[in-house]
Amino acid sequence: MALVGSRVELDADEDIFEDALETISRSPSDMATSGFHFVPCDTKRTSRQLGAPAVGRAEGSSAKVDLKSGLEECAAALNLFLSNRFKDALELLRPWAKESMYHALGYSTIVVLQAVMTFEQQDIQNGISAMKDALQTCQKYRKKCTVVESFSSLLSRGSLEQLSEEEMHAEICYAECLLQKAALTFVQDENMINFIKGGLKIRTSYQIYKECLSILHVIQKNKEEQHFFYEFEGGVKLGTGAFNLMLSLLPARIIRLLEFIGFSGNRDLGLLQLREGASGSSMRSPLCCLTILAFHTYISLILGTGEVNVAEAESLLAPFLQQFPNGSLILFYHARIELLKGNAEKAQETFRKCISVQEEWKQFHHLCYWELMWIYIYQQNWMQAYYYSDLLCKESKWSKATYVFLKAAILSMLPEEEVAVTKENVVSLFRQVDGLKQRIAGKSLPTEKFAVRKARRYSPSSGVPGKLVLPALEMMYVWNGFSIVGKRKDLSENLLVTVEKAEEALQNQNFTDYSVDDECLVKLLKGCCLKNLQRPLQAELCFNHVLESEKLLKYDHYLVPFTLFELAFLYKSQGEIDKAIKVLETARNNYKDYSLESRLHFRIQAALHLWKKPSSD
């Protein structure tokens, strides 16, 4: 179906729904006047003067901004962002945010990023308001068509070639804005209305990208006649590549459902499209690079197997490091890559530099605090880990329940006399967790739900609190930290010593309701340490102990499917691929309704994809 033909159906769904909702929704607040920026640029245009407005422009003027100026100034804005000049980027785009589609996209992205990073309700409202204005600006440039024209486009693809360059770019900008507005809609409130609104926006954005890909194929033969063909191509590659990549990560059962309603995702195709976009010289080429970097340095670890393409990540980052040696975002990725290589000390140094190079955007500091906290956990430097967890509790609003639980978990690893120095009450901290959980798109965050469940052991109703065993290492496992530690034999050996001490302590304690669960947790953690140390037979014994205790578990039922996942990778490392796949499928198909189920299904999907199992798709 051609784009102009499908728009009547797609936009009608959303517009009618949203118009009906406007009367019962809160009025959006005024657009934010400050924020931070993350929009595309051409990193090769280093000679261009950044931040210089076009001659003769003034805010409030009714003059039209041409496509060339919009593209150039959006590119300049990203250069400003990557140079830590966040407010300058905002001010460059602000005057024409209601006249130019690219200024609108860039400006609203700044405000949306502020909302996502701060998680303040007022910032979220500002972001939604800004993005709504941006959508209206983009709409002005989209092709206008009658119902008759829309119907005729169903019969002929010739209408694709009738779009002007400006109209084609308007579709790309509109799709990008829709996707961002959908993300904010999900975090705005937990009611079902917002969930449906967000879903409609994603559906519309996805359809626009599909049609833009069709347009790209049609105009390929005349690309020399298109002044901004490569810019349009870059937008298509970024959008379709990111959609394919993200959808492919979803568990198989969700993919089957989404395919039924018209979505599809292919990881290899998504990465190929992003790589093609990254290799070009369009304004969005850097964003294609940064998307791949995010996949390799974060997504593959948290929602994947932990097997990261570090070589590609380093290659992609190298030009950015040369051009923006003090850019916060670039330094952050650099530190992540060093950590994934096992260079924890170098990563610490780089994260600290990332904090020191700018004060304008404190949210970057919070990301670094999070990373530094985990590195100190890997090193078992508990006081330093506590320091950064405490900073997160005080300064960041992203996930208070997770931060407080982690702070309490870290303190639990310390002797009582050292905890006393901090003047913290560990039991009190654990009891705060339940009241701090939040909901997004009507759902509690899985990691927060996990923290709440674990913290219940300290509930006043339970009488004498039953102390958690190695809670910081359990959370480290949940966040796939053992994949990182596995690069360092010294860290793995030190962790094994700590786990074995906990194992011995459990054997000397009286039996309680928690004894089997605690013992199985320790065996899982011990097995992971042994696996990292290339001691597969001993690791397998630990994993089998957990599996044999399945019917005795009372609380931590997640331990069995997660242990099966680890056992599968143990078999894979020994060349028993068919056996490994069978174990993964057992974990996927035979267990449900346990903590962090969706996270494990993401990881199973990633593993089956890597192991080339057709039935897993």
Swiss-Prot record:
Source organism of the structure: Rattus norvegicus
Presence of the UniProt keyword Lipid metabolism in the record: yes
UniProt cross-references to InterPro entries, sorted A to Z: Iml2/TPR_39, TPR-like_helical_dom_sf
Purpose: Regulates high density lipoprotein (HDL) cholesterol metabolism by promoting the ubiquitination and degradation of the oxysterols receptors LXR (NR1H2 and NR1H3).
Family: Belongs to the TTC39 family.
Gene: Ttc39b
Superkingdom as given in the UniProt entry: Eukaryota
PANTHER family membership: TETRATRICOPEPTIDE REPEAT PROTEIN 39 FAMILY MEMBER, TETRATRICOPEPTIDE REPEAT PROTEIN 39B
Claim: Lipid metabolism is one of the keywords in the record: yes
Name listed for the protein in its UniProt record: Tetratricopeptide repeat protein 39B
TPR repeats: 328-361, 561-594
Alphabetic keyword roster: Lipid metabolism, Repeat, TPR repeat
Gene Ontology biological process terms in this record: cholesterol homeostasis; lipid metabolic process; negative regulation of cholesterol storage; regulation of cholesterol efflux; regulation of cholesterol metabolic process
